[in-house]
Structures are given as C-alpha cells and as structure tokens.
Amino acid sequence: MKLLIADDEILTRNGLVTSIDWKSLGIDQVFEASDGMEAYNTACTSKPDIILSDIRMPRLSGIEFAEKIKEILPDTSLIFMSGYSDKEYLKAAIRLKAITYVEKPLDLQEVKDSVQEAINEHQTRLQTRSSMKLQSKETSSRLAQLLTRPYNEKQEEIDELTDKLSI
C-alpha cells in the first residue's frame, strides 16, 4: 500500500516518516509533499491508497487538495491533521468521508490507529468489489447458459437475471 503525507511543517513530515514503522502496518511506499499543490501532483503520479494531510497548507489547502484528488482517486482514504479545531474543517472532513481527523500535536499511536483503520477500510472495499465482480460473472454466465436453451422454457429465470444485471 502507498501513503502520502502532506504537511507544510517539515518537522511533522519528518517525524511521521521516521517515527512510525510503516512496513509493519503494510505501507510499502511513503511519499511526502510540503504544500497542497505538491500533494496534488504527487498523488496524481503515485496514486496513494491513503493520504494523511494537514488542513492548512500553502498554495492549496488540505480541503481543496482532497476535493480535487477525490475526483480522480475516489477510493483513496483520507486522514486529516490539524492544530485547529474549526467546525468548518470538521464539516469538510465529514463531507469528504475522511477516515478521521487527528489533532496536533500528533499522538503517534493515534496516527497509527487511524492509518490501520484506513487500511482495514481499503481492504474491505477491495473484497466487496471482488465479491461483486464474482457475483456479476456468475450471473452473466448463468444468463448466457439460459439464453442458449429453448427460450420458452426459462422465461421467468431469464427475466430475473436480466433484472439483476439491469439489462
């Protein structure tokens, strides 16, 4: 899995990169960005599974960055960090379906727990998608089988399967 850490404070970025054993959490690659625009460009090229982003950053705020990135990477999990408890930031985080909102100064255990929650959500999403694909394949296969038989015998089953497939 890939993680992008976006924060304009170099000490925060370096602290997160060096203080947490990302490999033990299943994070293979960690990317960094020092502002919202760099975060956007990095996310477009690296396609992270999880983004850990500060709210207030130069050039593009964390909220603006997240809104833009959700358009092209809708399955990316968001975790916001901020030293400010502004209600508008919290509303924006909820609207963007962020995993959580971690307050600064950061508690490393809280960050790890948040990332683990994002990993779990990502894996659940992949399993659900895989199950849906399998079910769709099975339904399509069954429909193809029914369509190769005499039509008048299986009209009810054909209708049921076409409804399932929305065709």
Question: For the regions a protein language model found, what residue spans apply to each?
Answer:
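Short amphipathic alpha-helix used as the core "switch/output" element in two-component signaling
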Residues: 41, 63-74
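Receiver (REC) domain active-site loop signature in two-component systems and cognate sites
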Residues: 57
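Acidic catalytic/metal-coordinating carboxylates
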Residues: 35-38, 61-64, 82
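Interdomain helical linkers/hinges and coiled-coil/dimerization scaffolds
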Residues: 106-167
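Acidic, metal-coordinating helix/loop segments flanking the phosphotransfer/catalytic sites
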Residues: 32-50
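Two-component/phosphorelay signaling modules centered on CheY-like receiver
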Residues: 10-31
